[in-house]
Every structure is written in C-alpha cells, then in structure tokens.
From Swiss-Prot:
One of its GO terms (molecular function) is structural molecule activity. The gene is SEC13B. This is Protein transport protein SEC13 homolog B. Belongs to the WD repeat SEC13 family. It comes from Arabidopsis thaliana. One of its GO terms (cellular component) is nucleolus. InterPro entries: G-protein_beta_WD-40_rep, Sec13/Seh1_fam, WD40/YVTN_repeat-like_dom_sf, WD40_repeat_dom_sf, WD40_rpt. WD repeats lie at residues 9-48, 54-95, 101-142, 148-201, 208-251, 257-296. Gene3D superfamilies: YVTN repeat-like/Quinoprotein amine dehydrogenase (2.130.10.10). Keywords: Endoplasmic reticulum, ER-Golgi transport, Golgi apparatus, mRNA transport, Nuclear pore complex, Nucleus, Protein transport, Repeat, Translocation, Transport, WD repeat. Required for protein transport from the endoplasmic reticulum to the Golgi apparatus. It holds the Pfam family WD40.
Length: 302
C-alpha cells in the first residue's frame, strides 16, 4: 500500500495527524508548539493552509469536531492547556476557548459522537479526565473523573452513541455516554455517565498489559451485539477487549505481541479493521476472521 508524502512544514517531531470529516484537510500536532493545517487532494498534491500558534509546549494531539458544529479543531499540549480553534473566513483560525483545568500535560483529547452533543474528553498526566460540554449560550459545562489513573492518563476514547445490539432491538434507546481510558498504571478503564457524574463501569479495571497503555480505541459497533475496545501498550502488545451485555465482564485477548512499543490503534469507520502503528515505524492493518482469530490483511509502507 504505497503512501503519499505530505510536507507539513513542522520544525520538530509530529505527534499526531488527523484528517477532517471531508478528507480534504489534515491537522498536525508537533513538538515545535504549533498546529498546521494542510490541504490534500486525491492527485497527491498538498498545500499548507494555516499555522496555529498559542501553545507553550509540545502539542500532543488534535481533534476535529463534527462539521454540524462548524469548523472547530481542538488541541492539547504539554503546557496543560486545551485550545479550541474556530475557522471564520476560509483558513482564518482564531482561539475560541482555552481550557486550563489541568495542572500537568494534557495527553489525549476526543470528541464525543456528534449525536450526543459537542463534548470533549481530555486525559492528563495529573491523573484526571475532564469532559467539556458546550451549552446553548456559548459557555461550557465541565464534568470530571478525578484520579481516573492516579499516575497519569495517556488516552481517552468515546463509546459509540448507540448501544450494542441496537439494530436488532426495537423501540427508542437512550444514547450511550461511556468512555474508555488508558493510563500509566498499565490498565484500561471504562466509565459511564449516570445522573450527572462519571462512575467506573468495569470491575475490576482491565489488566493484561505490563507497561503503560499508550492508546485505547473504542470500535464503532454498527448495532452489533457486543462492545469492543482495542488497547496498545509500551509492552508491545495489542489487546482486544470485548463484552456482550451490560454488566458482564470484559474479556481480553492478545491480538499480537509486536516486540516494540505500540503507539496508536485506530478502527475503520465500520469497526471491522484495526490499524496499529508501532515503534519500528510499521503500520499494519488487522481483521477478525470467522473463527475469532485476528489476521493481518495489509501493511503500510513507511
């Protein structure tokens, strides 16, 4: 699978790359303390469109909001800030809001499924997870999970808004408000919003990794009768966690030991393909076979 090389113009390591909803622009986050927006086209061309400055430390992640809420990009940094950027005129970006709730590096951000509102989850080295939700008056409400992973939160990922099995059941279902998180305590945890506060929704925490969890990704379920979370760790393993009905125990299965740290795991939109990027500069794509085993279907050339 040959790739297209894109010159970002960053002057230091690029930590995150996110494509917008329409696949026309990418946002990149870098140790040079900036975010860059680059236009991309199918014929292989790319064009630098904007540079966003405001962070005072390396920028770890960027996340595009769903376009139904306008052209909004979130970023998080070692400086403890989460910045929301809004595009006014084309490629003219301004800081719309700066969240300074965290006192340490904010390592991960994720927008909730667009059906449940404009909500941003943030995980920090201070051990806390914060969730910022937009109000109709333009302000923001904040809910927190204090000491979610006391030694530091590395990653957050939202559950799909529809409950598992929704396609095969009838009647209206309440949207799902759940988060998965990974931390420096080597665990994956699941959280549920109930009566205005977040509570842990897995007992015990999901413990199969032997080193920091670097990334978690909750799979789109498309109404399938199970929930699936992938986690990648410093220990080199990717684990696929599944649970059937609400209240049952999560089961973890090792997809593979990559023998090098796993940095990112990412699901396809249909939830049947998982991309894994590892410390050897390899990106591999995996699919679950009929017998439940995972097999590699392709590799992306660096």
């Amino acid at each position: 699978m040959p790739g297209q090389k894109i010159e970002t113009g960053h002057e230091d390591i690029v930590h995150d790359v996110q494509m917008d909803y329409y696949g026309k622009r990418i946002a990149t986050a870098s140790s040079d303390c900036t975010i860059k927006i680059t236009g991309v086209s199918n014929n292989g061309g790319s064009q630098q469109l904007a540079t966003l400055t405001g962070h005072r430390g390396p920028v770890w992640e960027v996340a595009w909001a769903h376009p139904k809420y306008g052209s909004i990009l979130a970023s998080c940094s070692y400086d403890g800030q989460v910045i929301l950027w809004k595009e006014g005129n084309q490629n003219q970006w301004t800081q719309d809001h700066v969240f300074t709730d965290h006192k340490s590096s904010v390592n991960s951000i994720a927008w909730a499924p667009h059906d449940i509102g404009l909500s941003l989850a943030c995980g920090s080295s201070d051990g806390n997870i914060s969730v910022f939700t937009a109000r109709a008056d333009g302000g923001w409400d904040t809910s927190r999970i204090d000491q979610a992973h006391p030694v530091g939160v590395t990653s957050v990922s939202w559950a799909p808004a529809t409950a598992p099995g929704a396609l095969v059941s009838s009647g209206l279902l309440d949207p799902v408000y759940k988060l998965a998180s990974g931390g420096c305590d080597n665990t994956v945890k699941v959280w549920k919003l109930a009566n205005g506060s977040w509570k842990m929704d897995c007992f015990p925490a999901l413990q199969k990794h032997t080193d920091w969890v670097r990334d978690v990704a909750w799979a789109p379920n498309l109404g399938l009768p199970k929930s699936t979370i992938a986690s990648g760790s410093q220990d080199g393993k990717v684990i696929i966690w599944t649970v059937g009905k609400e209240g049952e125990q999560w089961e973890g299965k090792v997809l593979k030991d990559f023998m090098t740290p796993v940095w990112r795991v990412s699901w396809s939109l249909t939830g049947n393909l998982l991309a894994v990027s590892d410390g050897n500069n390899n990106v591999t794509v995996w699919k679950e076979a009929v017998d439940g085993e995972w097999e590699q279907v392709t590799a992306v050339e660096p």
